[in-house]
Design a protein with these regions (language model features):
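N-terminal secretion-targeting helices of virulence/extracellular proteins
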Residues: 1-151
Length: 152
């Protein structure tokens, strides 16, 4: 499904911020658990085959925890990248909306741009017409960028 201007207007970074925060907390907990496990395994002073087996199992478990922490960090980086993409698109939308308001233009839900300087003098109408043309290109780029963010 293609992204529309109306879809983009509903975007927010809040859910992505929340997920990134949850992943950061999970990563911290996993790293802490792996460190605690390594400390405990290192503290074992006994010798023997059972202790060697425990150390081997503990080392495998700590390596697994470290791998999970790495995976969580990778997910967190991806989420943060998506959040940055959404934030950039949102900033561009706000800029386009401000430009539209300043130049007697309207951006419709489908992303089409029109001039609304009907009751203005001829110079203002001409400027609004030119602004609408420029703004249409900007809106098209924002929609394209948003589609890329959504796809990535």
């Amino acid at each position: 499904m293609a992204i529309t201007w109306a879809d983009i207007l509903d975007w927010t970074t809040g859910p992505l911020d929340s997920i990134a925060s949850d992943l950061a907390a999970s990563s911290k907990a996993l790293v802490s658990a792996a460190n605690d496990g390594q400390d405990c395994a290192a503290a074992i002073q006994s010798q023997g085959s059972a202790v060697t087996a425990i150390r081997t199992a503990a080392a495998k478990n700590m390596a697994s925890l470290a791998q999970v922490a790495t995976n969580v960090n990778s997910a967190m980086m991806a989420i943060e990248g998506a959040r940055d993409g959404v934030a950039t698109v949102m900033a561009n939308v706000q800029s386009a909306q401000a430009y539209a308001a300043e130049n007697h233009c309207t951006i419709a839900a489908d992303g089409s741009v029109s001039s609304n300087a009907y009751n203005e003098d001829e110079t203002t109408k001409q400027q609004a017409f030119l602004a609408a043309d420029s703004l249409q290109k900007t809106v098209n780029k924002i929609i394209k960028d948003a589609d890329q963010v959504d796809t990535d």
